[in-house]
Amino acid sequence: MNKEERAKRQSKIRNFSIIAHIDHGKSTLADRILEKTNALTQREMKAQLLDSMDLERERGITIKLNAVQLNYKAKDGEEYILHLIDTPGHVDFTYEVSRSLAACEGAILVVDAAQGIEAQTLANVYLALDNNLEILPVINKIDLPSADPERVRQEVEDVIGLDASEAVLASAKAGIGIEEILEQIVEKVPAPAGDSEEPLQCMIFDSLYDPYRGVIAYIRVVNGTVKVGDKVRMMATGKEFEVTEVGVFTPKTTQRDELTVGDVGFLAASIKNVGDTRVGDTITHAKRPAAEALPGYRKLNPMVFCGLYPIDSARYNDLRDALEKLELNDSALEFEPETSQALGFGFRCGFLGLLHMEIIQERIEREFKIDLITTAPSVIYKVYLTNGEDVIVDNPSNMPDPQSIDRVEEPFVKASIMVPNDYVGAVMEICQGKRGTFIDMQYLDETRVTLTYEIPLSEIVYDFFDQLKSNTKGYASFDYELIGYKPSKLVKMDILLNNEQVDALSFIVHRDSAYDRGKVIVEKLKELIPRQQFEVPIQATIGNKVVARSTIKAMRKNVLAKCYGGDISRKRKLLDKQKEGKKRMKSVGSVEVPQEAFMAVLKMDDN
């Protein structure tokens, strides 16, 4: 293509993504847009088409972002090229959203006509505003009996401050309003800025590993043009490669000769090493490099850590490969090797949140067929010692000796919870039970309230979200951000089985609730650990002090079965002999801890 053709094509490109709270109909809307632009034949169409991972389809959530190029003939008779970048809506995957938005000029904000604005919608809108996107509100699910589009329209204006007078009323399921949405995209979303003659700058917003083609980078071209055969350089790592193919997704990968300004597509350059392409990096030409890299994304720090161990320790290296491949297209995952006396070799992994942790675990078990044991999730604590040093602890078993600790600080988050006002009491009760401090309460309209609390991250990390949902019948929505560290009275609790400490069961707990937690966990372990041939004491200790204890009684066979009648001293002899044997067994016996027992440490707040 020559310069004029490229410029004409550029003016017809529209890059947009769809943002919404979980379950407001984002993936269905994407399906309808694909149908309307005839991207697929009727036969290829299936629900949630862009959610390509099995896990996404099963859980009905979007985890990874996805990109697709569509051709649309607008009412003005012109052909437009639309790039739709689908994004997740769940709080753990905000990072994926921020990456999608950085590659767009516009965003469709989908709001459920019955439920209105929720916490996650707001968080994503602010991300879109940070990236200076044109936001087009769409009120979805207007065919629901409980829909109230006018109230929601008012809410969009009041809460977000967007002009919603031209908001499209749509129903993705019934296919209403799809054409209006496409027309608005063409009309209101600006064409990509940038110059096809400038030195090349492409932003990598995702990547995938293909065993045959190496690493495939998903890119958005900001300036310049990239063709097959070009020598390109990654600006962050300085590595150079020759481009073997470029192309676009029409959901399927379709090869092209070149990608130019505004294009969203993929680039393969037989990159074999996973570490050479970093998401957020800029690709430029080796011969004529760009003066500076594009502003990447802020690197996300993991909030939650846990140990992952292969059940079969021979598969340790397979687990490392699996984690490296997942890290490639999930740049928020971090991991490093660790060992545990109870579980052998494994990895300490950092995640953005619990859903993220669960998804990674399931992906390893499914995609790589490795059975895992996970330890209790924990957060990063800062421990200040009496000798003036400070240590960072992300694994409870590394906690220093209590005598040498001056104070411990833990991370706090500011949680905003949107909830119908019938449930305010229930939510406040949960937050107080989680050591939350009440900050603020605001009414959005007559029926909904936003509560703001400061809560320790370690309290949210396990089942806060589940409790919130179950106590508000699923109506509460919740978003949190880290605000920093504050001192807390924290102690480390160890669990001893048969007088031996099991390092993988240790956890850090607030001193006030230590006694109760200890009692609950000891009872729970008593139910879960199978009975042995000898008696097993279970103890919960803080330092050298035992705070709770329980005993698993021994299984024993009836040694008196053969004595019919007979003398008492004969029976006594047999019983004493059995006791002696059990004692010997106890001194050498070791106790197998099942995976359920590790999970029990986590699910302690069930009662």
Swiss-Prot record:
One GO biological process term: positive regulation of translation
Keyword presence, Lipid metabolism: no
- Please give the InterPro entries that the UniProt record associates with this protein: EF-4, EFG_III/V, EFG_V-like, EFTu-like_2, G_TR_CS, LepA_C_sf, LepA_CTD, LepA_IV
Per its UniProt record, what SUPFAM superfamilies does this chain match?
EF-G C-terminal domain-like (SSF54980), P-loop containing nucleoside triphosphate hydrolases (SSF52540)
Locate the residues binding GTP: D23, H24, G25, K26, S27, T28, N140, K141, I142, D143
Q: Which EC number(s) does UniProt give? A: 3.6.5.n1
Q: Which stretches make up the tr-type G domain?
A: 11-193
Query: Is Glycosyltransferase one of the keywords UniProt gives this record?
Result: no
Topology of the protein relative to the lipid bilayer: Peripheral membrane protein
According to its record, what are the GO cellular component terms?
Answer: plasma membrane
Query: Under the GO molecular function aspect, what terms does this record hold?
Result: GTP binding; GTPase activity; ribosome binding; translation elongation factor activity
Function, as annotated, reads: Required for accurate and efficient protein synthesis under certain stress conditions. May act as a fidelity factor of the translation reaction, by catalyzing a one-codon backward translocation of tRNAs on improperly translocated ribosomes. Back-translocation proceeds from a post-translocation (POST) complex to a pre-translocation (PRE) complex, thus giving elongation factor G a second chance to translocate the tRNAs correctly. Binds to ribosomes in a GTP-dependent manner.
Instruction: Report what the protein is called.
Output: Elongation factor 4
Q: Which organism is it from?
A: Bacillus cereus (strain G9842)
Task: Name the gene behind this protein.
Answer: lepA
